[in-house]
Amino acid sequence: MKRRWKKFLAGVLSAALALNLAAPLALAGSSTIGAACSVTSVFLYPEYVGRVDGENVSCIQGEVSYDHGLLTFHGDVTLTTVGVADLGTVPLVKALSEKNLRLVANGKVTGRTKGNGIEEAKEIAGGEYDLTYADLGAYLDTKPNGILGGDTGTTITAGTEITLKDFHTGIGGGDVRINGTVNITGAMFEGATYGIANFTTMNPGSELEIHADRYIRKDCLLTYNGGHLLMIVAENGDGNNIVQGRLSIGNDVSRFWYRTDENGAYTEINMKENYENFTAAIGQNQDYLELTDVDPDQPESE
């Protein structure tokens, strides 16, 4: 009798343990209260540790894991919320109760969505991200963001490469700090598309390339502390790309070089001597504007 009772208790304990381990992961349609973050249609809870798999196999292809605020993409991974995995305007990745969500990729993450790309992650660290907005008909209604910064800021670390294609806005939301490389390709449709629509900071060693109707939205600011900045107006741009008051040079920058033509010569700007030359240039519409903190005449090291 005692042996049977022990077996019964062991079975109950095993079932409870299995239920407890499964609980931290829920699919779309389940209760999402208290979820730490979501990846396509999958909601992850704070204590969850393990592999992330989608309800629809097309949503997540490749290996993704989660461990207490750390979302890791192992090798090449594809995320999608369109086509056979149609989830409406669901973002590819979204931080919820986890305000320090950290994304790490050691391969390439390819994403297609009808909503935002990455929402409110604290840090995007390492790897390559190629994200595309794929609902052209609803573009002006959805106004999707490639990266939506978090309330406490989002950092793109050095060594991270991000390409954002056809989003209404490349980077919006809370403050974003760029230490890596970001390439924003504006959508080729009627209506304003923005490269930057928040407060974004470029740091030394970073790269930011913007192809958009408007480089920086009104009342927003791009602070340049160094790196390589390239802004090119989209083919359907309306010619209104004055960035004076929207592009700020950081206090620690002593000099930089700029040009307003791809084949033109660079002009060196010394902040204490001829900064007014640069302010005059950005006070006019520029279909092309490029800044660098590395002397373009300096020979490249082998």
What are these regions (language model features)?
Residues 1-12, 21-30:
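Bacterial Sec-dependent N-terminal signal peptides
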Residues 11, 29-302:
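A composition-driven surface/loop motif
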Residues 13, 17-21:
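Hydrophobic core
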